[in-house]
């Protein structure tokens, strides 16, 4: 890897570009992810974009055959994209479920009308219950959101955080 700014200034340039990455690109990628269902295919694409941005930031070409783990090590970063998306989704879900508004009805699937032919679309609530895992059903998740302290503790446990946010 050739350094565009050789010497002691290279670390400052890397720090600056990593802060730009974390502030601007992640915000653009995570915009509106709270209310969308993330499929396995979309999850893989988001992780690929995250790695592509890190490679661009460090000026590592695909031709150099540097593994993703080495790129993460050089950048001093971790794969945080999906964890951040899931955290946002769970916070959004808990917030919406404690209110009696239209968003609540949409997320719980209580919308009138006929469903189209074919395979049912994956619901947001089902994908969230699948992510949380264990014996948590969509109905169980809705019940747990009523107690804010219990919900925050569960979110922290599922995401592996040390303290609830």
Model-derived regions: residue spans:
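Short linear motifs embedded in intrinsically disordered, charge-biased segments
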Residues: 1-165
């Amino acid at each position: 890897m050739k350094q565009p700014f050789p010497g002691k200034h290279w670390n400052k340039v890397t720090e600056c570009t990593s802060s730009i990455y974390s502030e601007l690109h992640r915000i653009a990628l995570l915009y509106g992810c709270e209310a969308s269902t993330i499929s396995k295919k979309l999850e893989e694409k988001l992780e690929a974009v995250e790695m592509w941005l890190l490679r661009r930031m460090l000026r590592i070409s695909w031709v150099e055959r540097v593994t993703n783990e080495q790129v993460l090590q050089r950048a001093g970063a971790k794969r945080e994209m999906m964890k951040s998306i899931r955290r946002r989704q769970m916070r959004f879900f808990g917030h919406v479920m404690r209110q009696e508004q239209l968003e609540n009805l949409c997320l719980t699937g209580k919308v009138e009308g006929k469903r189209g032919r074919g395979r049912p679309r994956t619901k947001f609530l089902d994908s969230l219950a699948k992510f949380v895992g264990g014996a948590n059903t969509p109905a169980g998740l809705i019940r747990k959101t009523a107690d804010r302290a219990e919900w925050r503790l569960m979110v922290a446990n599922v995401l592996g955080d040390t303290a609830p946010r």
